[in-house]
C-alpha cells in the first residue's frame, strides 16, 4: 500500500524547474516504452516510428547480455505527448532532444553523453524523491515498476517475457503471479493512463 501511495505522489508531482521535470517525464516515458533505458531513449530514431508503433532494438545491460532485443511498443497519447514535448530539432535523426543532431551512433563520445544524461536524470529524480518524502529511485526503477504493474493488472508471465525481451522465461519469473490473460497493447495503454502525463 505504501509503495502505491509513493507511486501516486511521484506521478502527480510537477516542478517549475525544467531539468527536474524533464527527468521525471523521461522516467514516465521509460515506463511507457516497456522499460526502455536512457540509452535506448537517447538513441531512438525518427525512422523507428510508424504511425502506430515505436520499433527499436533494446541493448540489454552488460550484467545480462549484450544481445539486441527487438521492441515493438504501441504508441498512445502518453507516449506521443512526450515525443512532442521533447522533440528533437527538425534536422535531427533522433526523436528526442537528448542528443545533439550531430552525435553519431556507435561512437564513444555518444556513449559517454548518454551515460552523463542518465546520471543527471538520476540526480534529479533523487532530489524529487527527497522533496516529496519518498525513498530514492533511479531511471532503472521505471522498468521494474512497469513489470510489477503489468503482472498485477492481468498480464501473463509469457506476455511480460515478450515485452521485457528476456531470453529465458526464468528471468521473468520474479514477477510471476497467477492472473487472467489480457491483450498486451490494451493493458499497456491502461497502465500508461496512470502516469499523469500533461
Regions found by a protein language model. Give the residues of each.
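Short, polar N-cap/turn motifs at the start of nucleic acid-interacting alpha helices
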Residues: 47-55, 135-136, 155-174, 198
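Short, basic, alpha-helical segments at the C-terminal edge of helix-turn-helix-like DNA-binding modules
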Residues: 189-195
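Long, amphipathic, Lys/Arg-enriched alpha-helical "connector/arm" segment
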Residues: 1-22
